[in-house]
Design a protein with these regions (language model features):
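Polysaccharide-binding and catalytic clefts of secreted carbohydrate-active enzymes
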Residues: 124-316, 320
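Sec/Tat signal peptide C-region and signal peptidase I cleavage site
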Residues: 15-19
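Hydrophobic faces of well-ordered beta-strands that scaffold small-molecule active sites
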Residues: 27-31, 53-55, 90-93, 173-175, ...
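Carbohydrate-binding surfaces of carbohydrate-active enzymes
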Residues: 236-256, 260-261, 278, 282-660
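Bacterial N-terminal signal peptides
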Residues: 3-12
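Short, acidic/polar
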Residues: 30-47, 152-165, 266-276, 345-353
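Acidic/aromatic-lined carbohydrate-recognition and catalytic surfaces
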Residues: 44-168, 180-183
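Catalytic domains of carbohydrate-active enzymes, especially glycoside hydrolases
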Residues: 35-62, 167-172, 283-284, 352-359, ...
């Protein structure tokens, strides 16, 4: 009876979401796929409230099925039919540019033995071939090969397999990171691939000989910049062809792309640029987790090892991914617990899930550092049921009201990654600490940004087209624009330009611009790394010793930011102020007291108040929805058309929204 009830609840939610795109409501976990385990997978999905079921039988990533996919195609079709029978959806995992041959040490035929010219190579000509121990998913005796997308015979077969999988009726094809091999030990600085096909394609496109005319790793070499951009374009073109082949068979089938890591030089290094690829893929899954004291890009780490600043930066990253995605969903393949002795797996999972809920991203439950299983099935069931019950509030598009805009520059991220990361994250940390409504603005959304105040933090690479659009905004007089640091000193190809072009713009539009010579974002990030975690372990306010640049930024914020919602208190919280279906809504996650490997239970937030300003209806009611709990209504105090509520104590997070 219990199983029937759970399934019925799941089906009700699925029916409710069916009118919208299913990929926006996914809460998933991974499963192997054989004909004889489909019923167990369906049972797991039904009993733990999965919506969108991942299965893995990887046709093109295993040499045997790359050659003959018949048996695996039958299993994919059976899985799709079974998922549809319970009004759910399923998607199948496949490799991108990686292929494994089992038992290669005894096999007569392996991918590399049969096709040595199809694999990626470093500048010395050494092939990207690996074995057991090089990565946890490679079994001893197996051959792991990395393929160039310019091996056209392989590519033709790959696209045929894509069409065959799509024809099974599966709802999505999930492609594991298609990247140039700059990941495994000894290959991080390879800037591969220098195989004959890739080198020839680069020379045809640019006239440059990659083997002789590119200074590998030299960001001041224009030929190296051309190589970097060519490699990114090559991956994007490959993914575009995959999508074309999928949609030629079934336009409803989703292209789901996994990407690692996220916001660092690594995008340029491996060639898989999430900003570019959001234009192509239907969904991007970010393999990206909270970090501990390293605070660098979140490719590694897990929830149990993260400190409060790591959590804040993880949420800033997710907000950035959501800005890149625009109307598309963002899935997070993040890890919660890896055996940390002092941490209860359930607590680590709840911290991870609450951060994803409050950022509007979709959750993927996984055991340890793999894509399948769970560290605690009861916790998954509890959380996924709560998400199921509140999915419309969590995943309906969040609209800005009166935000401060922060400009995200993909080129600056690639070309000046270290300084960019400090400035960008530090600027966002300022807004997080002050409880200010924010809007992350990208080159694609610059013209439709709703912010009245736009911060451009040390955006060193700024193209003429971007600069022209910023000047158009200034001419319209609708925004105040703040330039900081070395903004605009390089063009979109990293060529040094007139350093005074930003100052000339500021001079021409004095009333609508501010130029801060130093970089307040970097200054604030240094301060946060110095003292934030120590303060939040003990729930103490952190007093910032102002720098001159920070004072200039603070003065500009106080002058030009006119809030729709004001937040007081919550120094260890990360908040997003937004509008959902026309109603002011606030999402809050609490990380106070969390400590890497030591404590995963937050100190409850007890001293926080929120003021909703200039409301049109004095009869508005505040709905208070704590994470994993039921909604309750709060009474507030009116001052003219402003409504202030003192929040009850909450542990991990809360959603507040208004109703009439």
């Amino acid at each position: 009876m219990l199983q029937i009830t759970l399934l019925a609840l799941c089906l009700i939610s699925v029916d409710r979401a069916k009118a919208q795109d299913w990929s926006h409501f996914v809460r998933t976990a991974g499963h192997g796929l054989q004909i004889d385990n489909i019923s167990a997978t369906i049972k797991d999905a039904s009993s733990t409230y999965l919506y969108g079921i991942e299965v893995d039988n990887d046709i093109p990533g295993r040499y045997e099925s790359f050659l003959d996919p018949t048996e695996k195609l039958q299993a994919i079709k059976a899985m799709a039919d079974s998922a549809h029978a319970i009004k759910n959806h399923a998607f199948v995992y496949i490799a991108g540019l990686e292929i494994i041959t089992a038992n290669s040490d005894t096999a007569r035929h392996t991918f590399f033995k049969d096709h040595p010219d199809w694999v990626q190579r470093n500048v010395k000509g050494e092939p990207a071939i690996f074995g057991g121990g090089d990565a946890f998913w490679i079994t001893k005796g197996d051959e792991d090969a990395w393929i160039t997308p310019y091996a056209l015979e392989w590519r033709k077969i790959y696209m045929e397999r894509i069409r065959q999988m799509t024809a099974t009726g599966i709802d999505g094809i999930y492609i594991d990171i298609p990247y140039w091999m700059c990941h495994f030990k000894g290959w991080q600085d390879s800037w591969a691939s220098f195989d004959k096909y890739t080198v020839a394609a680069f020379r045809k496109k640019t006239g440059i000989n990659a083997l002789k005319q590119v200074k590998i790793g030299d960001w001041n070499d224009p030929n190296f910049i051309s190589w970097v951009n060519f490699r990114k374009s090559a991956i994007s073109e490959f993914v575009s062809e995959v999508k074309e082949n999928m949609k030629s068979v079934n336009r409803a089938c989703k292209l789901i792309l996994e990407i690692y890591p996220g916001l660092s030089e690594a995008e340029a290094r491996i060639g898989t640029d999430n900003y570019q690829l959001y234009k192509i893929a239907d969904v991007i899954t970010h393999e990206y987790s909270p970090r501990d004291q390293a605070y660098k890009d979140g490719g590694g780490g897990n929830s149990a090892r993260s400190n409060p600043l790591g959590w804040m930066r993880y949420m800033i990253a997710m907000f950035t991914f959501r800005a890149m995605a625009e109307e598309k969903p963002t899935w997070m393949l993040s890890y919660s617990w890896g055996g940390e002795e002092k941490i209860n797996p359930s607590d680590a999972m709840k911290n991870l899930f609450v951060s994803q809920v409050m950022s509007g991203t979709n959750s993927w439950d996984a055991a340890r550092h793999v894509m399948s299983g769970s560290n605690d099935y009861d916790t998954r069931k509890q959380v996924y049921k709560w998400i199921n019950d509140n999915e419309q509030l969590i995943y309906t598009k969040r609209e800005p009201m009166s935000p401060v805009g922060v400009y995200f520059s993909p080129n600056t991220r690639d070309y000046f990654s270290d300084s960019w990361e400090r400035s960008y994250f530090g600027t966002m940390e300022v807004l997080m600490q002050k409880g200010i409504e924010f809007e992350i603005v990208t080159p694609r959304t610059l013209d439709k940004s709703k912010s009245g105040l736009l911060l451009i933090p040390d955006v060193r690479s700024l193209g003429e087209e971007e600069l022209g659009r910023i000047e158009t905004i200034l001419k319209e007089g609708k925004k105040h624009v703040v330039f900081t640091g070395q903004t605009g000193e390089y063009d979109s190809s990293r060529r040094k330009v007139d350093k005074d072009r930003i100052k000339s713009l500021v001079q021409a539009y004095k009333e609508n611009t501010t130029f801060i010579e130093d970089d307040p974002g970097s200054d604030f990030d240094k301060f946060m790394q110095w003292g934030y975690d120590v303060s939040m372990y003990k729930d103490r306010e952190l007093e910032y010793q102002n720098s001159r640049s920070y004072e200039e930024l603070e003065e500009t914020l106080s002058k030009y930011y006119l809030p729709s919602v004001e937040i007081k208190g919550g120094g260890g919280c990360v908040s997003q102020i937004t509008s959902v279906k026309g109603k002011p809504t606030v999402y809050i996650a609490n990380f106070t007291g969390l400590k890497s490997k030591e404590n995963a239970i937050p100190i409850p937030e007890r001293d926080m108040s929120i003021t909703f300003k200039n409301l049109p209806n004095r009869g508005a009611i505040v709905n208070f929805i704590p994470f994993l709990e039921k909604s309750v209504q709060l009474k507030g105090v009116w001052n003219k058309n402003d409504l202030t509520v003192s929040l009850p104590s909450f542990l991990r997070g809360v959603i507040l929204t208004l109703s009439d």
